[in-house]
Curated annotation (Swiss-Prot):
Protein residues bound to ATP: 98-108
Highest taxon in the source lineage: Bacteria
Source organism per UniProt: Shewanella sp. (strain MR-4)
Function description: Catalyzes the phosphorylation of the position 2 hydroxy group of 4-diphosphocytidyl-2C-methyl-D-erythritol.
Catalysed reactions listed for this entry: 4-CDP-2-C-methyl-D-erythritol + ATP = 4-CDP-2-C-methyl-D-erythritol 2-phosphate + ADP + H(+)
Entry similarity comment: Belongs to the GHMP kinase family. IspE subfamily.
Enzyme type, top EC level: transferase
Keyword Methyltransferase attached: no
Disulfide bridges in this chain: none
An annotated Gene Ontology molecular function: ATP binding
E.C. number(s) listed in UniProt: 2.7.1.148
Entry protein name: 4-diphosphocytidyl-2-C-methyl-D-erythritol kinase
Length: 284
């Protein structure tokens, strides 16, 4: 087994179809309500089980490999420590998703690492156990482990499966890095959106409570969102910088992409209520 490479484990992006900030807890974390949906644009990871306990990461992005605090390595080590597995893994990351854009790429990479190595190491942890490990590494990781579109509450850890419409999306990645920590620490961030039941939230217009703040501070995000709103209902995902517009067909999304100004970068993706990772996990 140590010489075999298990290939093409997807780490899909997510969109926050809405994001409401309901308050700040005593520990500094924020209470929120959000709706996660996956899209079919993914990072790809390959794994090789090794007899030695080290975790080795390769990537086409040198900045990822140079980061000793990388979530992929932390996830592998956390699973190893939780299970006492004596071996290790060599991991290859093909980075396709924009970094720091609100698409959850780092969290998704970590979740795919936990799910894949749990199978390849035959450590037999349940999804609940994997999600518990993942939550210690990042609040978004459990939704990627569980692999279904979800309404999330709390700090994002309480998940309820939902089936929003699987639209086609045009995602624009502005040339801006938005610090999630800075957004949540900003005194101008709204923190008083009333908590509502899921049925009410699913039936009313969707919004992102972080959007106005980020748009006011990042002209690149404001420009991308203003352009996209000319073609479709559009919002920011997470704390940005990525924005997305929803279309009823791939043809419509591609037609808008063809008009994208030359100083913007974007891609078309399909909404998915079941993660590509779950499809890969269940493959023979």
């Amino acid at each position: 087994m140590s010489n075999e490479i298990s290939r093409n484990w997807p780490a899909p992006a997510k969109l926050n179809l809405f994001l409401h900030i309901n308050g700040r807890r005593a520990d500094g974390y924020h209470e929120l309500q959000t709706l996660f949906q996956f899209i079919d644009c993914c990072d790809l990871l390959d794994f090789r089980v090794t007899q030695t306990p080290e975790q080795i990461l390769h990537s086409d992005m040198s900045a990822v490999v140079a980061d000793s605090d990388n979530l992929i390595l932390r996830a592998a080590k956390s699973l190893q420590q939780a299970t006492g597995y004596p071996g290790g893994a060599e991991i290859w990351l093909e980075k396709r998703l924009p970094m720091g854009g609100g698409l959850g790429g780092g969290s998704s990479d970590a979740a795919t690492t936990l799910v894949a190595l749990n199978q390849l190491w035959d450590t037999q942890l349940s999804n609940d156990e994997l999600a518990t490990i993942g939550l210690k590494l990042g609040a978004d990781i459990p939704v990627f482990i569980r692999g279904f579109a979800a309404f999330a509450e709390g700090v994002g850890e309480r998940l309820q499966a939902v089936t929003p419409t699987e639209f086609w999306y045009l995602v624009i990645a502005p040339d801006a890095h938005v610090s999630t920590a800075a957004v949540f620490q900003d005194p101008l961030l709204p923190r008083n959106t009333p908590k509502l039941g899921i049925d009410t939230l699913m039936s009313q217009p969707w919004a992102n409570d972080c959007q106005d703040l980020v748009v006011s501070k990042y002209p690149q995000v404001a420009k991308a969102l203003a352009w996209l709103l000319e073609y479709a209902p559009s919002r920011m995902t997470g704390t940005g910088a990525c924005v997305f517009g929803e279309f009823s067909s791939q043809q419509q999304a591609l037609a808008a992409l063809a008009k994208l100004p030359s100083d913007m970068q974007g891609f078309v993706a399909k909404g998915m209520n079941i993660s590509p990772l779950i499809v890969r996990l269940n493959r023979p």
